[in-house]
Every structure is written in C-alpha cells, then in structure tokens.
Amino acid sequence: MNKLFFIGIAAGLLACASQPDQNENLMKQIQTNEYFEFVKEKALEVVKTGFNAGDGYGEVWIRDYNTFIELSAEVFENHVLKENLMVFFRMQGDDGNIIDGFIPAEKAGGGYDYIYSELEPRYAGHKNTVETDQESSLVQSVYKYVQATGDNSILNEKAGEKTVAERLEWSMDFLMNHRHNEQYGLLWGATTADWGDVQPEHDWGVYLTDDTHYAIDIYDNAMFLIALENLMELLPEQKEKWQPVHQQIFNNCRKHLWDETNQKFIPHIYLDGSPFPDDFNENEIYYHGGTAVAIEAGLLSKNEIKTSVEKMAENVKLSGAGSIGLTMYPPYPEGFFKNEGMYPYGYQNGGDWTWFGGRMIQQLIKNDFAVEAYEHMQPMVKRVKDNDGFFEWYTVNNEPKGSGTFRGSAGVLWKAIQLFEKFTKENNQQ
C-alpha cells in the first residue's frame, strides 16, 4: 500500500515537473511556426474585401459574421462594423426573429423567399428556417463587437422605435416563445446534420415544410447558452430574467442530450418521429461541430473535453479526413438527404470544415489543452498555405471545395493564432 502511494506521489511530481518543459517546447513551436504568419496576413487580406460569407455567396450571413467580426475589427472602422449589425436589427421580424442574411435588393435572386423591411429598403433578407442559430449568432456578434472595439453605444442605437438592447432581448424572447419545447425545456429546429441548415426531406432543404421532422440538438442549444451569457454581460440589469433560463437550458442539455455512457451528445431528440429508417442507429454518429460549441458554452468538464478530442482524433483516423474539422463520423448514408450535395462526406454531411474545427482549437487552448490544440491546428493552417486560400470545406481526401475566400474560416484560424500568441505571452511572464 505504501509503495503504491509513493509511486503515485512520484508520478504526480514528475507530471508537474514536465509541464514547464512541455510549455517551453510548445512556445518555441508557436514562435517559429512556418504557417502562422502566412495565415494571419492572408486572413487580413481576405477580410479587407468585404463581409459576404465568401466568393460563392452574395449575402452577409450572421452565422458567418459572428466568426469573423473580430478579424474585421482589425481593418475596418467601428461604424462600418456597426452598420452591418444594424441592418439585421432593421430587418428583424414582427415576432422578434432574426434573418440569416441580407443582399442588396437589386441583386436578390436564386430561389429564396425574400424578406423586406420598411426600415431597411436597401436590402433583401432571407432566413433558412430549418436552423435555430440566427438570433443567438446576432447576440454573440454584438458582444464580440463591443469587446473588440470598446464601443457599447450600439446598445442605445435605435432601429425604428426600439433600441438595440431591446431588440437583442426581443430576439431571445422569440426563441423562448416560438422555438422552445416545454416537455424537454430546450430549443427545437428541423432535423439537420449537426450545425447544418439542410433538412433531409427536401431537394434544397433550407425551409421548414409540411414533412419536416422537428428535433432538438446540441448545437442550437449551446449557441443559445453562449448568447444568454453574452446578453447578461451586455445588459446586467436583465440578468434576473435570463439567468434562470440559462440554468434551465444548461441543465436540460446535460439531462437530455449528453450520453454519459458513450461520452458524447446524442444527435437528435425527435418530437414526432425521425426522417430516417427505423433500423438506423443515429447515435453511432459523433457530431464534431456541436461538441465544440457545447465546450464553448461550458457544458463539458475537463475530462469530458479530453475524451471529446480523443474521439475526434480517432474519427479523423478512421475516416481518413484531414482535420478535426470533420463535421461528423460516420456520415449519414447515401440517400438519407434528398439534397444531392449531402452525400457521405459531402458538404455538411461529413465534410471537413475549418470553420468549426478552428472553434474546437480555440476551446482546447482556453481549457488547458494547448498541446493538443497545436497538434490539431497544423493540418488546418498547412492547407491554407498549400491552397493559397481559406476554403469553405475539404473532402475526406483533403481536397478544397466551395468558396476559396471563406471568411469564417479565416476568422476562426486568426483568432486561434491570437490565443496561441496569448498563451506564449502569459507563459513567458511566469
């Protein structure tokens, strides 16, 4: 017994002694990384050219802007960043909902059922109603704007008769009034592939339809948790109203969505049946993106985060993908989505997206897994240089697809590098 005790003490001391050496080695790697400077410069170059999601998109999307507004703050004046946010508030729905994106009205086309507002005649808006992240994305974007610029005057700006502060709360009220399921105490949306905005039942799949299968997933609810935290920091006088809501959503995510046995989030809770065959075991699928956002929302312990990144690394190995940006593993089988782009390992069904992989890197750094973060960052920054751009997604064979100037990818990698540099600075001061 005593021998085992002393062996345990010795092992603990050895681990403690090796940590400074490990950090020192990592700091050297960060400071001499052959890709980081290139990626930072390329990110600034790409973001200077505008605010649409990428060269394949005409619209400014709030879910994308949320991931590169801090990068944009490096090159644009505050009023330019603020104006983009104000467009979303001017186009807010009568029930408080927030659009996905906007485009100059004269360029509106391409099949969307466009939304117009008297408060903002210059633009046409659209909303992929299968998703439930637009409102949360706008709250997070305003928070990041205030953090990046120090300008909280936006909260008092008016769009019509309401201030931005009032409209932020209204958007959260929309989710509670129109997207909240009483039975589970969580937000719902359509069935999609993790964070995706394509449902299985339609050839395009971005709108709720009569044959939609309504479901609850971790991504929407984790985004809501982050938004509520941001809202309470922006508007501390409203904390009494929103703290109980945050606690309810947090507890119910753990209660209903976390699979303790398998140490993963279940893909969906179905409210009225699944769109998939009865003999399909959907819980075999591991959602990478939703897990990363859940970590950002504080839903997982250190041990659970460790298990999560280990599972992601194993999934990359099993799939042959290039990085932990892999949306999920295994993907949904052929034919499960009517949209032809959602084939196995295609687009949101198992494509490799730096846009979400980079968010996992950020959370690993913030949760003291900097070594693992650095390791998993390398394939993401390498392919930026190899392909001279920030591509939207990559195939399982690491081939670039989609927009080559995908600003969300640029934003998350740029921020991850900032966090690595902060890690180096803080450890140098110790």
For each predicted feature, which ranges?
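Carboxylate-rich helix-loop segments that flank metal/cofactor sites and access channels
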Residues: 111, 185-205
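Catalytic cores of carbohydrate-active enzymes
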Residues: 22-42, 60-61, 98-100, 173-176, ...
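Long, repeat-rich segments with strong aromatic
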Residues: 248-253, 298-306, 315, 319, ...
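Solvent-exposed loop and edge beta-strand segments that line ligand/cofactor-binding
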Residues: 48-67, 73-75, 120-133, 206-223, ...
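Aromatic-rich carbohydrate-recognition surfaces in CAZymes
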Residues: 58-86, 90-186, 218-221, 351-373, ...
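Long, intrinsically disordered, low-complexity segments
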Residues: 425-430
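C-terminal motif of bacterial Sec signal peptides marking the signal peptidase cleavage site
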Residues: 14-15
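Sec-dependent signal peptide recognition
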Residues: 2-7
